[in-house]
Design a protein with these regions (language model features):
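Bacterial N-terminal signal peptides that target proteins for export
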Residues: 1-11
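Bacterial N-terminal signal peptides
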Residues: 9-19
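Short, compositionally biased low-complexity segments
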Residues: 18-21, 57
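A beta-strand edge to alpha-helix "cap/lid" segment located at domain peripheries
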Residues: 26-44, 48-60, 67-168
Length: 168
């Protein structure tokens, strides 16, 4: 019983200690600060490519085997499918939209594997494809999780999973 009480006390102390952290607190478990900068630079490059309407550039850092789930629940695999989809959407219903993002967390599972949580906002969204509601304010908010790995010194996106977030 004493052991259980100690475990519960320690758990509560750890939870209380973390409660004061802001929601956007960065988690840095990589011994290599350059790794985090490199991953963040790719996320920034994605936003630049999106805002330029360049689907190929947006997909430049995905791995050949990327796992991709979009905010409509479509699941695709592989760099060609990811690239084709982004070329298509940036030339049709997302043409002219502006992507803004906030990196909420970069967490390194190992020095060569990082999970990045990103709050996305697409502004200027107009008519959507049939069956998909058009946001009345022209803004789509999503939570994007990207999983990066370092291959031969180069960071690539292994998984890209995007979900719709309703306004709070």
């Amino acid at each position: 019983m004493t052991w259980i009480r100690r475990c519960l006390t320690l758990t509560m102390a750890l939870l209380a200690a973390g409660a004061w952290l802001p929601a956007d607190a960065r988690v840095q478990t990589s011994p290599d600060a350059d790794a985090e900068r490199a991953v963040r630079a790719i996320v920034a490059e994605q936003a630049e490519a999106w805002n330029a309407g360049d689907g190929r550039r947006y997909a430049a850092h995905v791995s050949p085997e990327v796992s991709f789930t979009n905010l409509f629940g479509m699941v695709m695999y592989g760099a060609p499918a990811f690239t084709e989809r982004h070329v298509e959407i940036l030339s049709t219903f997302y043409k002219g939209t502006t992507k803004r993002h906030v990196v909420r967390r970069v967490r390194f599972l190992t020095p060569d594997v990082a999970i990045v949580d990103i709050d996305n906002e697409l502004r200027g969204v107009g008519a959507m494809p049939a069956g998909i509601p058009t946001p009345p304010d022209g803004i789509i908010r999503t939570q994007l999780m990207e999983v990066f790995t370092r291959r031969d010194g180069r960071w690539v996106i292994e998984a890209y999973h995007n979900v719709d977030v309703k306004a709070r």
